[in-house]
């Protein structure tokens, strides 16, 4: 009789059926948090069945945000959920796509590694997928082998694209043994309003489709807008051949951070550790209960305007939104994110209309010229009103453009938006010029991942971080043009952080005597924020917004600001001295 290999690491697969967007990622993340709170070492992985190598070149409206890991991988937004709930950094291996798998297999075929074989989906593609799944069980940098690997399989059961991944997962159970592998299936139990009934047939059919490919789920997550009664849970357990203890009702929760409590109430974590024979302790709720108190018992509310291009699809700014909320948790404050389309801020009147009742303005990252003048207009409005501003990546670049325009460089722009501008205060990075020119691959070639920065002592950012040595994740091709540092200084904007060699501008800010809080960073600090450990920049920004709200500023009348385009000089030699510097003095908090 064949014996299965001894496996110190257990594997748990999360699949989905009936419909997409049921919350597989949040379910997997919440279970990971529960197992971690039981003292287990957990890591996570997402299998994405699209042919792109990574999501880096996808439209944010289609895919949502691109989450960048410490090692510079562009990954699915669910990896961000994993990091936030587990409170640990993951690597690029946490996201596997069909594009990656096929690229590797085809490259091996070209090198002759399959010499003599007909390369097929089974076994070559599935073997490559299995290899990437099993690699997650290897010890990490601290030589700690995970107790559990949770692997989320993207898509829904029945999709053609997902079949190789489901087959690979089935083979992992065959290779490691049923005692070492757990299948969790997330399914929809719809409520039909006309009849007032909950219907179980979609879940039954979804499980039947899963069983037809050789996978019998150990537990079912029933997604519904209300609790599923015991009678229906018993029916589903019978018809789907699942232990009744593994039929888990998960009604919609008030907050995503309540989901671990919902799963624990249904005893899913206890069922998993028993089934996989894992050592465990009781759940330590100390940290999570403190978080939930801050989530549900805020002492006040602040309104933060997120001025972006993709605000019609909030997942495009998921990590930014979560970092803002986490910054609020630190202050026992609820952050209400006001989604503002950047196009609405292109004129002073438009900016005043949409930003009149907010307490802070956040300018997120992005690409392309659409909406840029609106982001700059929002910064101009916030500067004059004394509104706190935080600029991320492109947001820093917009702060620099607005600052240099205010001291006479009215054609100041980015080489990304206006290659022929006479004053490219934002320029293409030297190692990106061939890529921008179309002479090299576009995907996966930006300045990606964690890079160090040195902060100026006593600066706002140094005070926020509590140190002058920091590391942040990046994703950009453009940088502040060092030839314009004197013009930046003339505007009052201070370069408060650079790369260790002093070359690349990483942080800018206005001194407190000019404005209470305008900070820009070339990085994406939102990617390192955790609900239980908010990022210090977001803590400082939300704190400044709370101060702004508390100050009860008197109205400040802003002089009419002419549209820049109406006053562009005819010659590039005229723009520095031919425009009156009439930018209104920034307001100070009273």
Swiss-Prot record:
Family: Belongs to the CTP synthase family.
Subunit and interaction comment: Homotetramer.
Residues forming the catalytic site: 393 (nucleophile), 524, 526
Binding site for Mg(2+): 78, 152
Entry keyword annotation includes Acyltransferase: no
Protein name: CTP synthase
Region annotated Amidoligase domain, chain positions: 1-278
Pfam families in the cross-refs: CTP_synth_N, GATase
Other facts: CTPSs have evolved a hybrid strategy for distinguishing between UTP and CTP. The overlapping regions of the product feedback inhibitory and substrate sites recognize a common feature in both compounds, the triphosphate moiety. To differentiate isosteric substrate and product pyrimidine rings, an additional pocket far from the expected kinase/ligase catalytic site, specifically recognizes the cytosine and ribose portions of the product inhibitor.
One cellular-component annotation, GO: cytosol
BP GO annotations: 'de novo' CTP biosynthetic process; pyrimidine nucleobase biosynthetic process
Pathway: Pyrimidine metabolism; CTP biosynthesis via de novo pathway; CTP from UDP: step 2/2
GO MF term list: ATP binding; CTP synthase activity; glutaminase activity; identical protein binding; metal ion binding
Entry binding sites for UTP: 20, 199-204, 235
Gene that produces this protein: pyrG
Amino-acid positions noted as binding CTP in the UniProt annotation, renumbered to this chain: 20, 159-161, 199-204, 235
């Amino acid at each position: 009789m064949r014996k299965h290999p001894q496996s110190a690491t257990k594997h748990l697969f999360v699949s989905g059926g009936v419909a997409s967007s049921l919350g597989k990622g949040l379910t997997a993340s919440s279970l990971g948090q529960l197992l971690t709170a039981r003292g287990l070492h957990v890591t996570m992985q997402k299998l994405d069945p699209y042919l792109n190598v990574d999501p880096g070149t996808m439209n944010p409206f289609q895919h949502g945000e691109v989450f960048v890991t410490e090692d510079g991988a562009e990954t699915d937004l669910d990896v961000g959920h994993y990091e936030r709930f587990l409170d640990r950094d993951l690597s690029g291996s946490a996201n596997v796509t069909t594009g990656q798998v096929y690229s590797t297999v085809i490259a091996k075929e070209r090198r002759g590694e399959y010499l003599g074989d007909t390369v097929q989906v089974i076994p070559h593609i599935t073997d490559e997928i299995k290899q990437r799944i099993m690699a997650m069980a290897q010890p990490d940098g601290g030589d700690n082998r995970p107790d559990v690997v949770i692997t989320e399989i993207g898509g829904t059961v029945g999709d053609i694209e997902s079949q190789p991944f489901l087959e690979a997962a089935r083979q992992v159970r065959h290779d490691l043994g049923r005692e070492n592998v757990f299948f969790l299936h997330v399914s929809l139990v719809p409520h039909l309003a006309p009849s007032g009934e909950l219907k179980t047939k979609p879940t039954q059919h979804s499980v039947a489709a899963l069983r037809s490919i050789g996978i019998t789920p150990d537990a079912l997550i029933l997604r519904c807008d209300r609790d599923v009664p015991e009678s229906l849970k018993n029916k589903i357990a019978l018809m789907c051949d699942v232990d009744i203890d593994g039929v888990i009702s998960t009604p919609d929760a008030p907050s995503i951070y309540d989901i671990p409590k919902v799963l624990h109430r249904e005893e899913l974590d206890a069922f998993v550790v028993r089934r996989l024979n894992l050592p465990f302790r009781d759940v330590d709720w100390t940290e999570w209960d403190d978080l939930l108190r801050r989530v549900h018992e805020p002492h006040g509310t602040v309104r933060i305007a997120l001025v972006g291009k993709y605000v019609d699809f909030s997942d495009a700014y998921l990590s930014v939104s979560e970092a803002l909320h986490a910054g609020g948790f630190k202050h026992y404050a609820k952050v209400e994110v006001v989604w503002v389309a950047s196009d609405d801020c292109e004129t002073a009147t438009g900016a005043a209309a949409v930003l009149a009742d907010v307490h802070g303005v956040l300018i997120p990252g992005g690409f392309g010229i659409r909406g840029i003048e609106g982001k700059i207009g929002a910064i101009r409005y916030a500067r004059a009103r004394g509104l706190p501003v935080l600029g991320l990546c492109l947001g820093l670049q917009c702060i620099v453009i607005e600052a240099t325009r205010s001291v006479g460089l009215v054609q100041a722009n980015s080489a990304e938006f206006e290659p022929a501008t006479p004053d490219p205060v934002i320029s293409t990075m030297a190692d990106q010029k061939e890529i921008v020119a179309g002479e090299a691959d576009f995907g996966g070639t930006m300045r990606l991942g964690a890079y160090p920065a040195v902060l100026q002592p006593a600066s706002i950012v140094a005070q926020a971080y509590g140190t002058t040595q920091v590391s942040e994740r990046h994703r950009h091709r453009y940088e502040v043009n060092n030839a314009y540092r004197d013009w930046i200084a003339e505007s009052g904007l201070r370069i408060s952080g650079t790369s260790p060699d002093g070359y690349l501008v990483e942080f800018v800010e206005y001194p407190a005597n000019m404005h209470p809080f305008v900070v820009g960073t070339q990085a994406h600090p939102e990617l390192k924020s955790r609900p239980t450990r908010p990022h210090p920049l977001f803590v400082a920004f939300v704190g400044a917004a709370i101060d702004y709200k508390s100050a009860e500023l008197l109205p400040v009348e802003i002089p009419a600001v002419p549209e820049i385009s109406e006053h562009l000089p005819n010659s590039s030699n005229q723009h520095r001295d031919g425009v009156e510097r009439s930018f209104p003095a920034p307001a100070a908090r009273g």
